[in-house]
């Protein structure tokens, strides 16, 4: 009997969908403003200069605009019965800037309605948040309903957690290419929704090559490190390793850069990259384009400022060392199925991806509308330029169909109301992105590190076996923290950070 009291107390504090609700609350309170702060604003081509910068965003409780123009609060049950969306309006502070250069003048800020945000039942901005069982009954809800889902066009939609490989961590593996074994160190470098796969490969002939987005083909590691500021052979070796066995593996790479490519300085290396990314262009443009590629596409999680190139060079050295050690046998392959090498994208993270994409489309539309006003010799008006349907419809369409940003399908699903257990099971489901038609024996197997995190028995039969999983009943999922805040805290308490 006492154990029952303890279990009840635990689930009063930690509901079965707490992971999704916490993630969504974090999205509303922090991530939306973060996405808006990432954007510099709206830059137009209007003669005389006209820009718009963004301020604070405001999200209210769910409301509905009636046919007669009146606005009133909407409850989840009303949204179900009337086939409406349970969503909250978004208001964004916009600051117009008129003129160019020193003559630029800042006008007073305007708060503009930019669209509707789908609201998760049970979240802080939901009318049901913190309500007692009696209040839930008055709202027409089942007091035992787990919540944690959305209502779109009257249909209940559950957003299913997606399993992904860990971002921003070096993983080592051996891969067979052309009947030969290649030793690879790779990292899924992720920053503000942009995911770049950067790899350092050690080929069977001992040469190290790097691949990353923005480069049409692989580039020798030594050339790339020279472009990032490590000019001398000694400097490159020191950045990789001081172990004699590892250093011996670098000799062929240093000779290749000097003898085959004739690259001895940072400028030579930048020009070599420039020839690949901007062929046939003047030298100055090539150098500038090469630096832009290195800043924006090489290891973007470390920063996109030119001051971060030295840190990126150190990081590449670490990746090169790992791939050489993997070849020498002093390092083992990373286990991709180890749960420390996995991360879950919960409702808030998936909504963040969707909102970022929808908001960028809204910015493009605002720019187009402002420029069209100028062509028609009208005074630019922000209120007239913002078409709230752009953001609203993109988000609602994704929620209704399950077709998400990045080509993912089945992210949102119709809530299974077959039974209470079926509903809870769906809200605690975890889906792997791996293809159902491939064997993937290791990925489907039960891994020892899933103990206490993933239910060992609840997985479907057939092609989804082992790829569709469920969280263990007392599993907790923490929300992600931004690296910048952690690094700042480390500095404040007096610790140093080399990279």
Swiss-Prot record:
The keyword Flavoprotein does not apply. GO terms for molecular function: DNA binding; DNA-directed RNA polymerase activity; ribonucleoside binding. The keyword Manganese does not apply. GO terms for biological process: DNA-templated transcription. GO terms for cellular component: cytoplasm; DNA-directed RNA polymerase complex. Part of the RNA polymerase complex. It catalyses: RNA(n) + a ribonucleoside 5'-triphosphate = RNA(n+1) + diphosphate. This is DNA-directed RNA polymerase subunit Rpo2N. It is found in: Cytoplasm. DNA-dependent RNA polymerase (RNAP) catalyzes the transcription of DNA into RNA using the four ribonucleoside triphosphates as substrates. The Rpo2 subunit (Rpo2N and Rpo2C in this organism) is implicated in DNA promoter recognition and in nucleotide binding. Belongs to the RNA polymerase beta chain family. Its EC number is 2.7.7.6. It comes from Methanococcus vannielii (strain ATCC 35089 / DSM 1224 / JCM 13029 / OCM 148 / SB). Pfam families: RNA_pol_Rpb2_1, RNA_pol_Rpb2_2, RNA_pol_Rpb2_3. Keywords: Cytoplasm, DNA-binding, DNA-directed RNA polymerase, Nucleotidyltransferase, Transcription, Transferase. It comes from the Archaea.
């Amino acid at each position: 009997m006492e154990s029952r009291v303890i279990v009840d107390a635990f689930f009063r504090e930690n509901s079965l969908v707490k992971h999704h609700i916490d993630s969504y609350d974090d999205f509303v309170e922090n991530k939306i403003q973060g996405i808006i702060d990432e954007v510099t604003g709206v830059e137009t081509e209007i003669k005389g200069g006209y820009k718009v910068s963004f301020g604070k965003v405001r999200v209210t409780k769910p409301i509905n605009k009636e046919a007669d123009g009146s606005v009133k609060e909407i409850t989840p049950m009303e949204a179900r019965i009337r086939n409406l969306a349970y969503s909250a309006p978004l208001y964004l502070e916009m600051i117009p800037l008129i003129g160019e250069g020193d003559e630029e003048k800042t006008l007073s800020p305007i708060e503009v309605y930019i669209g509707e945000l789908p609201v998760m039942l049970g979240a802080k901005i939901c009318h049901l948040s913190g309500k007692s069982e009696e209040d839930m009954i008055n709202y027409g809800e089942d007091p035992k309903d787990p919540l944690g889902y959305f209502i779109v066009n009257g249909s209940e939609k559950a957003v299913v957690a997606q399993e992904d490989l860990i971002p921003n961590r070096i993983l080592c593996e051996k891969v067979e290419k052309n009947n030969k074994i290649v030793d690879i160190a790779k990292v899924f470098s992720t920053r503000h929704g942009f995911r770049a796969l950067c790899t350092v490969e050690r080929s069977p002939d001992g040469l190290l090559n790097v691949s990353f987005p923005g480069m049409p083909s692989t580039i020798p590691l030594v050339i790339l490190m020279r472009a990032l500021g490590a000019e001398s052979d000694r400097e490159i070796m020191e950045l990789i390793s001081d172990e004699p066995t590892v250093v011996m593996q670098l000799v062929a790479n240093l000779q290749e850069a000097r003898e085959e490519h004739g690259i001895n300085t940072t400028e030579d290396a930048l020009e070599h990259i420039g020839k690949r990314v901007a062929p046939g262009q003047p030298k100055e443009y090539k150098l500038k384009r090469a630096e832009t590629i290195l800043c924006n596409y090489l290891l973007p999680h470390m920063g996109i400022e030119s001051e971060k190139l030295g840190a990126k060079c150190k990081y590449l050295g670490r990746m090169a060392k790992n791939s050489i050690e993997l070849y020498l046998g002093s390092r083992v392959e990373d286990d991709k199925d180890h749960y420390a090498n996995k991360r879950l994208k919960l409702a808030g993270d998936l909504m963040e991806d969707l909102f970022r994409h929808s908001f960028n489309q809204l910015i493009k539309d605002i720019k187009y509308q402002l420029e069209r006003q100028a062509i028609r010799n009208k005074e630019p008006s922000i209120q007239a330029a913002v078409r709230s349907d752009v953001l609203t419809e993109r988000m609602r369409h994704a929620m209704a169909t399950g077709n998400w940003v990045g080509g993912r399908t089945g992210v949102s699903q119709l809530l299974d109301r077959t039974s209470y257990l079926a509903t809870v099971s769906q809200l605690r489901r975890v889906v792997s992105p791996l293809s159902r038609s491939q064997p993937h024996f290791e990925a489907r197997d039960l891994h020892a590190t899933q103990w206490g995190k993933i239910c060992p028995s609840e997985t479907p039969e057939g092609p989804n076996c082992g790829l569709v999983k469920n969280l263990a009943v007392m599993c907790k999922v923490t929300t992600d923290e931004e690296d910048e805040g952690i690094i700042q805290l480390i500095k404040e308490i007096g610790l140093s950070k080399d990279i």
